């Protein structure tokens, strides 16, 4: 099930077939539709639509095209509309310097006033931005980020990576519409690659911006599936991954839908199955959300208790249908080495491929060289190097005090031993960490240690 986070089904383009369009959306797997107001009248119509369909929600706000008509009465009406229980956001509001249907000074003035009203009412905002990057960022930075609260959604994102990163830093989600499917939208697709899963949405902006392959026709919520499929392709995940992550994001922003339930033991991303054995770890990496938000691609990896080997094995269906089975959660799998070995043995006997994701502390944790014990059980190992020297490693990965001032060297020793017993060995780092020379890390992996190297972008978990 997918969510269309931005549509305008109240518009006259749907006057003749609105019910059938909404029915087609449901039949195509659309779980919720957020119908977005553009002025007071359309906001009122959005509410009326939400009252007829339990899966349709509404927003209220005035689009930058229409702010030239705003007065005190309009603000009073908006305030009243926001008392309705199905109005879950304020918008769409913002700046549009492409068409300039309203004078820019009025756009800026009413954007600020609507932001202030949204904050007073405690509502997230739906942001419209077109060709107004500098003023947009200048205005938003006066109000966001909020302490402990998300800001809202940059809808139908069309900006560059810098705008996306600065919007993310202020607490906004980024939503992609039909243009991400357009033939010449390579820059936009590059941005779609780097949005963290927990800040991602997809939308239609119906009736506008119909995605390929239906471009040129009137848009409708069912087409959000095309956009979601393209975003999944761009990000190297499945459409199910996009559906799951955006559904959780919708719940976390608006409280609509379902929370991700804790206790996940096995979880599928792309065509790999991951096994979550523990939340304990010998590191407390500065970039890790193990304690604050143990969620990966919409799965909640918080464990009520550590699963037994039997429970782990029983959580797996058919090992042969996956590209690989990966021991990887937010904790360090080698803290439960016996479980790793017992389950890996069964996976191999059933014809599966096994990969171990580890911080490379396994020999120190278990006080022996564990690599010979993994021979024949583990086909591939990914080891988190994360730094180009011991001092940087201790600052970024924050190992247990007893492991500092030397664990980095032990990780290199672990890698050298892994090469003797495991067919595929890879070193990984998380990018954008202060004080880390990423080029030097690649040299250490390739030239010094003679293994493959992979850099994972900060905040791109899973």
Regions of interest found by a model, annotated:
Residues 30, 87, 122-123, 197, ...:
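A structural motif
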Residues 308-330:
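Short Fe-S-cluster ligation motifs
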Residues 34, 57, 126, 153-155, ...:
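A structural signal for isolated positions on well-ordered beta-strands in alpha/beta enzyme cores
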Residues 260-291:
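N-terminal pre-triad scaffold of radical SAM enzymes
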Residues 1-254, 272, 287-294, 300-313:
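Mid-domain alpha/beta scaffold segments of enzyme catalytic cores
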Residues 330-462:
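Conserved AdoMet/S-adenosylmethionine-binding subsite of the radical SAM
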Residues 245-266, 450-462:
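Short, basic/aromatic-enriched C-terminal tail that caps enzymatic domains
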């Amino acid at each position: 099930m997918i969510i269309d986070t931005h549509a305008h089904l109240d518009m006259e383009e749907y006057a003749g077939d609105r019910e059938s369009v909404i029915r087609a959306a449901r039949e195509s797997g659309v779980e919720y539709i957020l119908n977005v107001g553009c002025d007071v009248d359309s906001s009122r119509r959005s509410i009326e639509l939400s009252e007829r369909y339990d899966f349709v929600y509404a927003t209220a706000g005035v689009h930058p095209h229409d702010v030239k008509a705003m007065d005190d009465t309009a603000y009073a009406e908006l305030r009243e509309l926001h008392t309705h229980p199905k109005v879950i956001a304020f918008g769409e509001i913002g700046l549009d310097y492409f068409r300039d249907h309203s004078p820019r000074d009025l756009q800026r003035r009413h954007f600020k006033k609507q932001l202030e009203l949204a904050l007073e009412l405690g509502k997230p905002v739906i942001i419209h931005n077109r060709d107004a990057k500098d003023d947009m960022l200048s205005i938003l930075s006066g109000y966001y980020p909020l302490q402990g609260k998300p800001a809202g959604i940059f809808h139908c994102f069309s900006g560059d990576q810098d705008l996306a990163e600065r919007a993310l830093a202020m607490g906004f989600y980024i939503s992609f519409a039909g243009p991400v499917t357009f033939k010449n939208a390579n820059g936009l697709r590059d941005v779609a690659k780097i949005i963290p899963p927990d800040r991602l949405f997809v939308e239609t902006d119906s009736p506008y911006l119909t995605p390929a392959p239906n471009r040129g026709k009137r848009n409708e919520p069912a087409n959000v599936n095309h956009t979601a499929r393209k975003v999944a392709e761009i990000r190297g995940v499945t459409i199910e991954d996009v559906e799951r992550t955006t559904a959780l994001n919708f719940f976390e922003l608006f409280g609509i839908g379902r929370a991700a339930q804790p206790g996940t033991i096995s979880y599928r991303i792309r065509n790999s199955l991951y096994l979550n054995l523990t939340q304990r770890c010998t590191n407390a990496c500065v970039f890790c959300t193990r304690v604050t938000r143990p969620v990966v691609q919409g799965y909640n990896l918080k464990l009520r208790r550590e699963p037994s080997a039997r429970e782990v094995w029983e959580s797996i269906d058919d090992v042969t249908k996956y590209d690989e089975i990966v021991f990887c959660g937010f904790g360090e799998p080698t803290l439960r080495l016996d479980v790793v070995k017992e389950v890996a043995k069964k996976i191999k006997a059933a014809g599966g491929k096994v990969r171990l994701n580890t911080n490379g502390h396994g020999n120190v944790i278990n006080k022996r060289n564990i690599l010979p014990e993994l021979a024949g059980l583990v086909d591939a190992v990914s080891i988190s190097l994360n730094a180009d020297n011991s001092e940087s490693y201790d600052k970024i990965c924050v190992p247990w005090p007893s492991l500092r001032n030397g664990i980095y060297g032990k990780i290199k020793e672990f890698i050298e031993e892994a090469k003797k017993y495991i067919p595929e060995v890879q070193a990984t780092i998380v990018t954008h960490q202060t004080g880390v020379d990423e080029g030097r890390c690649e040299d250490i992996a390739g030239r010094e240690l003679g293994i493959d190297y992979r850099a994972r972008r900060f905040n791109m978990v899973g």
